[in-house]
């Protein structure tokens, strides 16, 4: 079978080694004669899977001991509600930074539970889309928390600054599309959450990292399945968790450790992004409209000089084994999502195709 590279924004490409191991173990996991999907989440066999996955995740991100790690249902959108329902306490105002589509979606959900103060961070620099520097965000004194999205998959915008607002500001962040792709200081955050379907594993699982002192503040209206305290007290097994997704996430964590951990992935991701943006920037045929300081290393949107060629580009790229390059309907054009599982060879294959397509149609 010819090599295929999947540039989908999510559900996204998984490491080939992980898929092969899961395939080998699918029908007879660890000699039990059953699949890992079929065993009890409360049995000792799966408890070991769950504990190892959490330990490896903690190791990869150097998560301090005073933070809980929760394996949840509901996706990122579930946490759009989970954050205010758990963190507001007796306050009604929270700061929300709007830098793109997903940040705006979080604001929309938050309005059901509080009065979000929206900080519009979208700016233009030299004709390119950018984000107001974090140091210039105007926060509300006494706000319950500050929420932002470090990586916007649709807009191709990243906020890589490290929060430094003081101990009195609780920072909540949606790391769904950038978790484990670069090193972060977890101590700077009160809550970090991430849907699994980009850099962790398959869809259906969401990870939450929450500082222990923020537990016990949930609204009485908070559903138990979103209550961080309930989930923590039950080791993320208040109800039956997405066990197969949890198992696959554990395999991905072990794969990441074998690659050298997050620091090694950070370097590889930088190489991949530089290669792809380099071809775009040095071409009169392709363009990206995000300022360099805010370009995403995970999601690279680009336009062709002539949109009439979009359909042909997608047809030819698919035939060449380069799949899921169509841009989001909101922005159009193309988008290459190059998460951790995308090898450098995959990006090289894409850039080689782009240069060849330009030679033939430019």
Curated annotation (Swiss-Prot):
Gene Ontology CC: one annotated term: cytoplasm
Record gene name: serC
Family: Belongs to the class-V pyridoxal-phosphate-dependent aminotransferase family. SerC subfamily.
InterPro entries: Aminotrans_V_dom (IPR000192), Aminotrans_V_PyrdxlP_BS (IPR020578), Pser_aminoTfrase (IPR022278), PyrdxlP-dep_Trfase (IPR015424), PyrdxlP-dep_Trfase_major (IPR015421), PyrdxlP-dep_Trfase_small (IPR015422)
PROSITE patterns: AA_TRANSFER_CLASS_5
E.C. numbers: 2.6.1.52
Protein name: Phosphoserine aminotransferase
Annotated localization: Cytoplasm
GO BP terms, alphabetized: L-serine biosynthetic process; pyridoxine biosynthetic process
Job description of the protein: Catalyzes the reversible conversion of 3-phosphohydroxypyruvate to phosphoserine and of 3-hydroxy-2-oxo-4-phosphonooxybutanoate to phosphohydroxythreonine.
Record text on subunit structure and interactions: Homodimer.
Recorded catalytic activity of this chain's protein: O-phospho-L-serine + 2-oxoglutarate = 3-phosphooxypyruvate + L-glutamate; 4-(phosphooxy)-L-threonine + 2-oxoglutarate = (R)-3-hydroxy-2-oxo-4-phosphooxybutanoate + L-glutamate
Pathway: Amino-acid biosynthesis; L-serine biosynthesis; L-serine from 3-phospho-D-glycerate: step 2/3; Cofactor biosynthesis; pyridoxine 5'-phosphate biosynthesis; pyridoxine 5'-phosphate from D-erythrose 4-phosphate: step 3/5
The species this protein was found in: Klebsiella pneumoniae (strain 342)
